[in-house]
């Protein structure tokens, strides 16, 4: 199933509610079809970001959320080449200490115009996603696309629980309806 913000009209794309509703739909689907074990998706890092910031983001994700086992089977057509000095890496990673929110603030400080770590990357990471590859997409304004996956069983309880409660409520209504019909 292909779902993404491209299906949302432009004026609502950067708002949190559509993304929340998309994730809610994803959770509903995974609960209805438990034979599917993984979600796979792409996240884009816009070419509006500097090469330095793009390199920082990729290194940060590879340092903290990379799955080398799965990544060995993926070969990007046009792999993004990280351009960072070791001193820059050490400074940023010492300052952020693998904390997504601290890292997001670093990107905000480095980038002009209030650019932050892309929302979809933050959302995937908060859902326990793993990154496996990065590719430059010349057909999408040379954005860097990250390929990520989530093992359904690794979704946080805070994501699944509200939908499970909704399922439970629906189930109870159906049972009560059937009892009333007897």
Question: What do these predicted ranges mean?
Answer:
Residues 1-130, 135-144:
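Acyl-donor binding region in acyl/amide transferases
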């Amino acid at each position: 199933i292909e779902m993404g913000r491209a299906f949302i009209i432009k004026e609502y794309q950067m708002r949190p509610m559509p993304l929340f509703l998309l994730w809610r739909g994803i959770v509903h689907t995974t609960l209805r079809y438990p034979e599917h074990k993984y979600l796979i998706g792409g996240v884009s890092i816009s070419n509006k970001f500097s090469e330095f910031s793009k390199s920082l983001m990729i290194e940060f994700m590879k340092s903290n959320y990379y799955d080398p086992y799965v990544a060995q089977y993926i070969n990007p057509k046009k792999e993004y080449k990280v351009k960072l000095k070791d001193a820059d890496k050490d400074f940023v990673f010492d300052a952020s200490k693998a904390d997504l929110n601290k890292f997001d603030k670093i990107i905000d400080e480095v980038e002009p115009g209030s650019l932050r770590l892309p929302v979809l990357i933050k959302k995937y990471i908060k859902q326990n996603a793993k990154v496996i590859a990065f590719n430059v997409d010349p057909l999408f304004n040379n954005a860097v696309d990250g390929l990520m996956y989530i093992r359904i069983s690794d979704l946080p309880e805070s994501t699944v629980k509200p939908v499970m409660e909704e399922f439970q409520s629906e189930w109870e209504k159906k049972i009560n309806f059937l009892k009333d019909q007897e």
